[in-house]
Curated annotation (Swiss-Prot):
Record family assignment: Belongs to the conotoxin P superfamily.
Name by which UniProt lists this protein: Conotoxin Rg9.1
Free-text function comment from the UniProt entry: Probable neurotoxin that inhibits ion channels.
Organism: Conus regius
Pfam families the record matches: Toxin_11
Record comment regarding domains: The cysteine framework is IX (C-C-C-C-C-C).
Main location: secreted
Stretches that traverse the bilayer: none
Length: 90
């Protein structure tokens, strides 16, 4: 099958566009809410604090109870998870 140069260029551009939608935006790159101008970075927790990490669960819900020391409350799941940072916060 013989494609013209223009068809090849269009096909390459479409592939780059399709791959760009999946690869181009990483989870930590979106930092500002376009509608409200809120800095979303301050609302996000690092991806390394995943509940899939062994031992990350602190063992309690945090909807009405404060999390234990070195744990944080996940805002959507309402569960306490262990801090995974190497440096402690003040």
């Amino acid at each position: 099958m013989h494609l013209s140069l223009a068809r090849s260029a269009v096909l390459i551009l479409l592939l780059l566009f399709a791959l760009g939608n999946f690869v181009g935006v990483q989870p930590g790159q979106i930092t500002r809410d376009a509608d409200h101008g809120i800095n979303l970075r301050s609302l996000r927790k690092q991806m390394s604090r995943s509940p899939l990490v062994k031992g990350a669960f602190c063992g309690q819900a945090c909807s009405s109870v404060k999390c234990p020391k070195k744990c944080f409350c996940h805002p959507e799941e309402k569960v306490c998870y262990r801090e995974m940072r190497t440096k402690e916060r003040d």
